């Protein structure tokens, strides 16, 4: 019953497809009397939170980073910070968490539970560079230019000398992984979702 939120369709300009997908989702969610939605993807988080209400789909929307922060604060998750304490980790801000929803401190708070060696990229937070996948760009051919965005962003990572990139978006994960492969750095630098780092820190 679960289907795409319609975010890629709307970003690509196919409003009819977006509304069809959105209304189908709202019908299913309302049939289960859903009040709260926990999202993994920032694109889904943004569209459920900020755009579905215009179509009658009003829910409490929580991103999993917020959920993890609360679980850590309440002592529900016990993290062994020795596993990554000396590992140099940088964080890539997903556009739909950062720019669209001003969620900058929450992922960094999670990371501070994992490592003492966190390093910011020069372009971070409000100045962070997109990974290149947003706005449905992931589903189309690259436009003409001197360099693709995912390569530019990977070069930002390399300047930090980090051995782990952390992010919180499946689109960003794909683009950063591709960037590491393009630069032949996939053996030296690993790409993790924040939830994966937490899981490994808990020896799960």
Model-predicted regions and their roles:
Residues 1-204:
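Iron-sulfur cluster-binding electron-transfer modules in prokaryotic oxidoreductases
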